[in-house]
Amino acid sequence: MSRAVGIDLGTTNSVVAVLEGGEPNVIANAEGLRTTPSVVAFSRDGEVLVGDTAKRQAVTNVDNTISSVKRHIGTDWTKQIGDKKYTPQEISARILSKLKRDAEQYLGEKVTDAVITVPAYFNDAERQATKEAGEIAGLNVLRIINEPTAAALAYGLDKGKEDELILVFDLGGGTFDVSLLEVGKDDDFSTIQVRATSGDNRLGGDDWDQRIIDWLVDDFRKTTGVDLSSDKIAMQRLREASEQAKKELSSATSANIQLPYISLTESGPVNMDTTITRAQFEKMTEDLLERTKNPFRDVLKEAGVSVDKISHVVLVGGSTRMPAVSDLVKRETGKEPNKGVNPDEVVAVGAALQAGVLRGERKDVLLIDVTPLSLGIETKGGIMTKLIERNTAIPTKRSEVFTTAEDNQPSVSIQVFQGERELTQDNKNLGTFELTGIAPAPRGLPQIEVTFDIDANGIVHVSAKDKGTGKEQSMTITGGSGLSQDEIDRMIKEAEEHAAEDKNRRARVDQKNQAEQMVYTAEKLIGDNAKVNEEAKKELQADIDSLKSAIQADDHDLIKAGTDKLLASQQKFAQSVYETTKDDPKEQVVDAEVVDEDSGSSK
């Protein structure tokens, strides 16, 4: 039976976890690390690099390296690489494919199913696009769940026997969410219900990094007169240095940034050597921190809960390691945030638990999530008429009857929106469809029943029915990406083809490594056996030289032929070694017993 995994597809890093014996375990990647950078690069020879290998070469391959793609998921953003345009789904699928491969390598069996997490405040387009990315990667996406919900699931199951409120403060690399969850306990069963959620999909650790970058560029311009902002390679180096400085400032009061040869002027190379203090960093990012307060207060207001009712505060996302963030949470809640969870891993652990629940491996928990934004349709005057309010538990289904605005109106256009504003022009348009064939009648007489159905993934299905004629029309919101099933199928096929290419490339590398090892062994064999006749040595050396040339030329067929030939001549040489040893009296083996001198007994 194939396995199901939980995946935290993050802006900066991604993590995969699995249930083993009913307990979640984070899987280390092929490089031995428990987190994988969400970075994809296309090398000059056509190889696709993902994770640490992609991140390490970013400075020398800026134009073909993509990071933080999660910030574009569900939009029409594309990245031109060579003669091909890549969508956020395709880039995300590369990351998911690596996590899938690493999990399969660890488990020793196929991984087909996955629960993938998204920020709680992701809209329908972003959720649908994430699901598509999973499909392109060859995964059956069992469920899309919210990151704070997953974190609460991982954290809340082992917390006592009482009903408790858990506040999850999730500040990742590119998104921010706050969720309030209620954990209900009943003997050996837990119910985790989201009471309210809020957030900002354009706020994350990347924004803190950018403030350091801007400061460095400005400071360098003032001190040297050199503007680095148009130098792509310099900016990539600044980006990496800024991220590192941010991390250092979580535990130190200052960080030194040294970047030799950052630029070249008429006078020669220019170096960067500067220090940023934690106080400076917190001052330049205080407005970003301020933006986290309103979502926190909105959640308490939505749930009708006072702050003193919160039992636990959980910090999620690597950005919560910044002292200013944890201090703010402590001030706002009056509680010390829990330090017992790994903010980088807890979301993937929760996703693995949910995968176990959906596969029947865990039967002790029920997860009830909510829709983060209100859903409705446009009515006369551009009014946003809500059918499903935000923070409604999902899955859910709601219907409402509308009528025509004009006499003898033959059709109605159903425009679906998501958001909290009063006018549709200020909300997110999810799609439009027509209900035709309405019988001629005075305005206000026809009855058009509009139904919204949100599934457990938070993905929206809408239908409209003329109650008079029985005519019905429906649509599933396919996301802002607008990918058709044919396009998704094409991308899946391309991903499969690429997987085969990767497999062949790895096989060629393995073959080359094996050939180099064989050359080393054969050369050592000659060196260790000087007494073997010269003819045998010459024959083996000729095959060694031939294989070396094939390796140098990187010719797959020549390496294979050369390896086979060297193996045969190596065996022949070994036979000559044996014959030489047999003829040499000094090398002959003497059979004897070992005698114990103390007892005189033989052994």
Curated annotation (Swiss-Prot):
Per the record, residues carrying Phosphothreonine are: 175
- Region annotation Disordered: residue ranges? 578-603
- What does its record list under induction? By stress conditions e.g. heat shock.
UniProtKB keywords: ATP-binding, Chaperone, Nucleotide-binding, Phosphoprotein, Stress response
User: Known PROSITE patterns for this protein?
Assistant: HSP70_1, HSP70_2, HSP70_3
InterPro entries, alphabetized = ATPase_NBD (IPR043129), Chaperone_DnaK (IPR012725), Heat_shock_70_CS (IPR018181), HSP70_C_sf (IPR029048), HSP70_peptide-bd_sf (IPR029047), Hsp_70_fam (IPR013126)
| Keyword Membrane included in the entry's annotation | no
Question: What Pfam families does this protein's entry cite?
Answer: HSP70
- The reply to whether Chaperone figures as a keyword in the UniProt entry is yes
**Basic and acidic residues bias (residue ranges):** 580-589
Q: Spell out the Acidic residues composition-biased ranges.
A: 593-603
One GO molecular-function entry: unfolded protein binding
Hey, which family's this protein in?
Answer: Belongs to the heat shock protein 70 family.
The function of this protein is:
Acts as a chaperone.
Protein name in UniProt? Chaperone protein DnaK
User: Which source organism does the UniProt entry give?
Assistant: Tropheryma whipplei (strain Twist)
